[in-house]
Amino acid sequence: MILEVAILNVIPGREDAFIEAFSKAQDIIKKMAGYISHQLKRCLENTSQFILLVEWEKLTDHTEGFRGSKEYQVWKGLLHHFYDPFPTVEHYE
């Protein structure tokens, strides 16, 4: 199992809209091959920052399967305009 860790810095004032968009986007990722689970947590000290933790069966399920899919294009359209700067994403085993 691989853990994807993404630090998401949302443009201040857009947090509620981001949470609403993420509630739609999470339905996309849940259907992807190799997906196990995910959590989105909001930072207590910096309420514009979130951490996204996604468990994948293997690294390529995320880096090739999800990111190479048409579903990822929908995910990007829902979420990427909220970020500044663009998220740091790393993987752990």
Segment roles from a protein language model:
Residues I2-N9, Q39-R67:
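Short, well-ordered beta-strand segments in beta-rich or mixed alpha/beta enzyme
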Residues M1-I2, E93:
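Absolute protein N-terminus
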Residues I19, S23, S69-K70:
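Conserved GNAT-fold acetyl-CoA-binding loop/helix
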Residues N9-I19:
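Short, surface-exposed ligand-recognition loops at beta-strand->loop->(often short) alpha-helix junctions
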Residues R42, H91-E93:
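A general secondary-structure junction signal
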Residues D27-S37, E55-V89:
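An amphipathic, aromatic/His-enriched active-site/gating alpha helix that lines ligand/cofactor pockets
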